[in-house]
């Protein structure tokens, strides 16, 4: 769910709180990583790729559920995710690291679109 007020003591908001804190503290790093994604994927493609990742993580990592939500084939979703993972963590990084870094890029992208501060 969405959290209006971010508080680490609220179990419903803990992850969102930590993501925002990390994004705020490491804004230069996240911005650099986001720009590198932008160099690899065109504007519209970057939008599609990040929407794919967001749907995948919102579906709890279920390829089937995310593919259904996006109205794409499961193989398409897996292909996009592999391309994103390789762009964010080329040759290294476990699933947690890939998810964390991609979620930071998704958050950064959404903040750019909304033109609002990270916190």
Question: Predicted regions: what is each one?
Answer:
Residues 1-119:
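Cytosolic nucleotide-utilizing catalytic cores of signal-transduction proteins
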């Amino acid at each position: 769910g969405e959290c209006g007020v971010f508080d680490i003591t609220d179990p419903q908001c803990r992850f969102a709180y930590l993501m925002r804190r990390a994004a705020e503290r490491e804004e230069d790093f996240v911005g650099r990583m986001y720009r590198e994604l932008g160099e690899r994927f065109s504007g519209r493609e970057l939008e599609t790729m990040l929407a794919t990742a967001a749907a995948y993580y919102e579906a709890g990592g279920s390829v089937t559920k995310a593919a259904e939500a996006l109205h794409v084939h499961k193989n398409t979703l897996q292909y996009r995710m592999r391309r994103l993972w390789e762009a964010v963590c080329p040759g290294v990084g476990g699933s947690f690291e890939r998810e964390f870094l991609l979620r930071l890029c998704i958050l950064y992208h959404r903040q750019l679109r909304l033109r609002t501060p990270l916190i």
